[in-house]
Amino acid sequence: MPVFKAPFNGYSVKFSPFYESRLAVATAQNFGILGNGRIHVLELAPGAPGVTESVSYDTADAVYDVCWSESHDSVLIAAIGDGSVKIYDTALPPPSNPIRSFQEHAREVQSVDYNPTRRDSFLTSSWDDTVKLWAMDRPASVRTFKEHAYCVYQAVWNPKHGDVFASASGDCTLRIWDVREPGSTMIIPAHDFEILSCDWNKYDDCILATSSVDKTVKVWDVRSYRVPLAVLNGHGYAVRKVKFSPHRRSLIASCSYDMSVCLWDYMVEDALVGRYDHHTEFAVGIDMSVLVEGLMASTGWDELVYVWQQGMDPRAS
């Protein structure tokens, strides 16, 4: 399976929604504590195990997350450790990038998510305890959402409702928001420890998953959220990212500081259906391809990016 070695520690990996062979990777020097960052755009070789870098962009601070535009196939957005949000166009020569840079967050930007239904806006979340809404044609953020009492590690759009998003915070709450409303519409005390990630089910717009420092992944139904639908135990340390499959309703991927990537089917009794122990440092980034069913990617502090098919060994050549 394809493996890419980056010079810095991996933080995030995202498949392109337009090209099945293209990925973007966010990396940071010195584990994101101090130093530069780099964004890599990778291409999978058709019918071969190789992966090549088509372009890279250096940043003066760590890159914690990256996402692709849902409306322009060459555009990606990066969340930077200096509080900035930068937009890149891979169709332009590297010296022309970034094409835009926004400096509004007061602390590190932890996540960025492009609206999959409206296709003209995106969210960022930050260690400054806020979530910001941005429009591609605006010179500044459209709105700032300030309710969380601690770092907002991730904010993600609902896949079916273009005005609804969820945010996961170190204040131990999961919040549901509608951008048409003045405040959050729902507050779920989802874990007793910091919540590091959240994601919506791609087939049921009322179901979402959270992951936490408490080593669990939990599945929630916003129509009845006093008790989780499922609690998934199996990781040995904090669960850094959680991601619902775009192809199978009940399939969830997660990655952890225990260096593993796990696959779960939350609707069956023995929920842990796959475990991959290919990373040798914290596994912190995971994605599943929308265009190729079963294709997964992960990255971690071991500076490696793996791309593999579910059920295969990520390290197999």
Swiss-Prot record:
SUPFAM superfamilies: WD40 repeat-like. It is found in: Cytoplasm, Cytosol; Peroxisome matrix. Expressed in siliques and leaves, but barely detectable in flowers, stems and roots. Disruption phenotype: No visible phenotype, but reduced sensitivity to indole-3-butyric acid (IBA) and inefficient peroxisomal import of PTS2-containing proteins. The binding of a cargo to PEX7 is necessary but not sufficient for the targeting of the complex to the peroxisome. PEX12, PEX13 and PEX14 play a critical role in this targeting. PEX7 is required for PEX5 stability in light-grown seedlings. Belongs to the WD repeat peroxin-7 family. One of its GO terms (molecular function) is peroxisome matrix targeting signal-2 binding. Receptor required for the peroxisomal import of proteins containing a C-terminal PTS2-type peroxisomal targeting signal. Specifically binds to cargo proteins containing a PTS2 peroxisomal targeting signal in the cytosol. Cargo protein-binding triggers interaction with PEX5 and formation of a ternary complex composed of PEX5 and PEX7 along with PTS2-containing cargo proteins, which is tranlocated into peroxisomes by passing through the PEX13-PEX14 docking complex. The gene is PEX7. This is Peroxisome biogenesis protein 7. One of its GO terms (cellular component) is Cul4-RING E3 ubiquitin ligase complex. The WD40 repeats are involved in the binding of PTS2-containing proteins. The lineage of its organism: Eukaryota, Viridiplantae, Streptophyta, Embryophyta, Tracheophyta. GO terms for biological process: protein import into peroxisome matrix; protein targeting to peroxisome. Keywords: Cytoplasm, Peroxisome, Peroxisome biogenesis, Protein transport, Receptor, Repeat, Transport, WD repeat. Transmembrane segments: none annotated. PROSITE patterns: WD_REPEATS_1, WD_REPEATS_2, WD_REPEATS_REGION.
